[in-house]
């Protein structure tokens, strides 16, 4: 179609004269227009044929670019570079992410310790060289799947292993730091609280029992911690150094603000050693001059006293208070008994005991003769006055006499004797009818006019 330049009427391309105004069209313009339209149509056909090829070429370029991008971030060499850069730049968070596994979460503080350990025990330059060589060998090998980087002393510090592929083309390398177990062995039941793997952790260790506190990657650690015992709460650190371990465990050194108490007693020579006690903060314990008591927190006062027995009576020292400001890691204290008071009491009791022993010697000398006479004559009346009527011992001896099973005794010796009210306990050494020496414990009752009678007996 074309338009009349004079009146604007639309007409077919092959019409020579406008049907409305009679204007005569130029035949050369129509021919030119027809030629131009044909050229455009031809060019359009050519363009449509080229588009698929252009799209295909563009996609190919994109694939090539994508491959190189993936290679830059996912090839074994790229994975190695990421770890190396993180260690070189002390990027503890990145190192923690790279080393963490499902079974062992590594936090940023552990990673920081690990980075320093690598730089100190391997050397950064050597570590980078060893790591690149190891990755290269694993990547080329058809059989090897894992290898270790080691410290100068031969400790395994990093495990490098193949772990499948990435995006079909690239071997996936895994970097894992070996772990060991730090162990504690407290003198008494202890609760430890600290942070591990980014989380708060609590470990309860029984007295004198080896207890692991977790799994840690190699490093030299000084972990802030709290510990609690029956003696109180302590703030400080758990310290352990993997350079000092050739096994799967490493000993923990405790560094807490604590005081240990050494006690010296004076004026205690007359006290029974087994009866001596020390009371610290209301907790009573057996005394030993070679023992160290504690530990106790250094931020709280400590009260301490001692006690002991002599001739059945308990004696105590004055209670002393050690101020927190005076507490040291090793603190010595002396506690004094009133030696004159103890000696006076012991002297008095010894006089009483000597008097009692003399009475008992006389009693058992008569009893042994009466016992033997009752045996020889089969007559309980010989011995009945020495035994309290109605007691189980009275009935037992009477039965033995009637059956002829009463034992002969001789040479009684008083080994020990104590009196409590009207009751007396005595340890007596005898020789039986077989000629054997035996120790027997007797209980007696002191009646009117200081008359003694046996109540019961047993062999010691």
Curated annotation (Swiss-Prot):
Bilayer-crossing regions: 50-70
Conditions for induction: Transcriptionally regulated by the vraSR two-component system in response to cell wall antibiotics, such as teicoplanin, vancomycin, and oxacillin.
Extracellular face residues: 71-460
Location in the cell: Cell membrane; Membrane raft
One Pfam match: TcaA_2nd
InterPro entries named in the record: Mem_prot_TcaA, TcaA_2nd, TcaA_4th
ZnF locations on chain (C4-type): 4-21
Membrane-protein topology: Single-pass membrane protein
Ranges in the topological domain labelled Cytoplasmic: 1-49
Gene Ontology CC terms: membrane raft; plasma membrane
Alphabetized UniProt keyword annotations: Antibiotic resistance, Cell membrane, Membrane, Metal-binding, Transmembrane, Transmembrane helix, Zinc, Zinc-finger
A GO BP annotation: response to antibiotic
This protein's record includes keyword Transport: no
GO molecular function per UniProt: zinc ion binding
Similarity-based family: Belongs to the TcaA family.
Function: Plays a major role in decreasing resistance to glycopeptide antibiotics.
Protein name per UniProt: Membrane-associated protein TcaA
Species: Staphylococcus aureus (strain N315)
Gene name per UniProt: tcaA
């Amino acid at each position: 179609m074309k338009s009349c330049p004079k009146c604007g009427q639309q007409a077919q391309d092959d019409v020579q004269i406008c049907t409305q105004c009679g204007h005569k069209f130029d035949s050369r313009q129509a021919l030119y227009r027809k030629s131009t339209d044909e050229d455009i149509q031809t060019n359009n056909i050519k363009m449509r044929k080229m588009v698929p090829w252009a799209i295909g070429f563009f996609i190919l370029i994109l694939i090539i670019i994508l491959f190189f991008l993936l290679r830059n971030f996912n090839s074994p060499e790229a994975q190695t570079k990421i770890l190396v850069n993180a260690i070189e730049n002390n990027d503890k968070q990145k190192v923690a992410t790279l080393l963490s596994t499902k079974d062992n979460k590594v936090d940023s503080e552990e990673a920081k310790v690990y980075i320093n350990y690598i730089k100190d025990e391997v050397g950064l330059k050597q570590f980078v060289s060893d790591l690149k060589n190891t990755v290269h060998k694993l990547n080329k090998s058809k059989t090897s799947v894992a290898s270790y980087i080691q410290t100068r002393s031969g400790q395994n510090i990093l495990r490098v292993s193949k772990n499948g592929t990435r995006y079909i083309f690239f071997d996936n390398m895994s970097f894992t730091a070996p772990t060991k177990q730090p162990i504690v062995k407290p003198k008494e039941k202890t609760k430890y609280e600290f942070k591990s793997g980014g989380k708060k952790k609590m470990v309860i260790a029984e007295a004198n029992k080896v207890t692991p506190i977790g799994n840690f990657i190699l490093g030299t650690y000084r972990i802030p911690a709290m510990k609690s015992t029956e003696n109180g709460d302590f703030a400080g650190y758990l310290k352990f150094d993997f350079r000092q371990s050739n096994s799967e465990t490493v000993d923990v050194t405790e560094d807490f603000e604590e005081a240990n108490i050494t006690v010296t007693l004076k004026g205690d020579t007359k006290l029974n050693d087994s009866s001596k006690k020390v009371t610290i903060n209301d907790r009573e314990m057996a005394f030993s001059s070679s023992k160290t008591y504690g530990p106790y927190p250094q931020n709280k006062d400590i009260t301490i006293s001692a006690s002991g027995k002599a001739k059945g009576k308990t004696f105590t020292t004055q209670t002393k208070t050690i101020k927190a400001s005076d507490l040291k890691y090793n603190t010595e204290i002396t506690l004094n008994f009133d030696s004159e008071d103890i000696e006076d009491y012991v002297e008095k009791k010894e006089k009483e005991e000597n008097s009692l022993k003399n009475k008992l010697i006389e009693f058992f000398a008569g009893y042994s003769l009466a016992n033997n006479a009752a045996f020889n004559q089969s007559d309980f009346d010989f011995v009945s006055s020495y035994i309290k009527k109605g007691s189980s011992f009275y009935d037992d001896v009477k039965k033995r006499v009637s059956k002829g099973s009463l034992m002969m005794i001789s040479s009684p010796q008083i080994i020990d004797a104590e009196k409590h009210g009207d009751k007396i306990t005595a340890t007596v050494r005898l020789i039986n009818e077989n000629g054997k020496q035996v120790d027997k414990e007797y209980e007696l009752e002191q009646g009117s006019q200081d008359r003694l009678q046996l109540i019961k007996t047993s062999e010691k």
